């Protein structure tokens, strides 16, 4: 089984509502699973811009996409700079934008990049190798309280205090598997017996912090809304509650959803004209078949907004 099957592929492409001559953006190129499907639906007038922080992902995706057609441009950069990355290419309005926030870029499988808690490698975790902050610096130089806060805030780790205490006691720590053993030693037996890997939350927290993922997502989504043509859509696939909260808040604030909920209980009619509408009231989850075939899809949710 390919563990990098694109999640919610059919649903996200369907809800993107692709026009053959439209301009589309894939903000998370990764292994080009979604980009490939978008490109297949475009004619010679249509065009795809795909963004990734990692040059390895871009180099590999280029070969794959060229087999479909050449109506695309791959951009190395952080999607938090979405407007600027497109403006450089004289693009100011688009017909659809896709985000797949799952970690599926090629670098995850390379032990030397330090993302995996299953393979030994240096404590790195940078998506963009041009950035400077690494997991090694955080683990070996941050205070116990700083590390605890990162694990709790970005990993929702209930045992953040005991893990951070063990980390500080065990310094210096140089490899991913060394860190995994330290995390395990800080956790009670009942947690170690659970199905989920005991280091998953800590590694998620470090990755999010080092790559500034949540702030990048918030900034990018706000820019994405401003880029939409009329009837254009944004589709976002989230994988954990921290991402969900950001998407939900931005989408609901943009559509007057909260105001409508408030006024629905009052005996007044208000004209709440909004520039955007939620295409689906509740996010779409994977089908039972997809859940069976692709373990990555278990926590995935698809959110869709449209400009009126």
Swiss-Prot record:
MF terms in GO: rRNA (cytosine-N4-)-methyltransferase activity
Native organism taxonomy: Bacteria, Bacillati, Mycoplasmatota, Mollicutes, Mycoplasmataceae
Reaction catalyzed: cytidine(1402) in 16S rRNA + S-adenosyl-L-methionine = N(4)-methylcytidine(1402) in 16S rRNA + S-adenosyl-L-homocysteine + H(+)
Family matches, as HAMAP family: 16SrRNA_methyltr_H (MF_01007)
E.C. designation(s): 2.1.1.199
Gene from which the chain derives: rsmH
Protein name (record): Ribosomal RNA small subunit methyltransferase H
Positions annotated to bind S-adenosyl-L-methionine: 32-34, 52, 79, 100, 107
Protein family according to the UniProt entry: Belongs to the methyltransferase superfamily. RsmH family.
Main location as per UniProt: cytoplasm
Gene Ontology cellular component annotations, sorted alphabetically: cytoplasm
Keywords: Cytoplasm, Methyltransferase, rRNA processing, S-adenosyl-L-methionine, Transferase
One of the GO biological process terms: rRNA base methylation
Biological role stated in the UniProt entry: Specifically methylates the N4 position of cytidine in position 1402 (C1402) of 16S rRNA.
Organism: Mycoplasma mycoides subsp. mycoides SC (strain CCUG 32753 / NCTC 10114 / PG1)
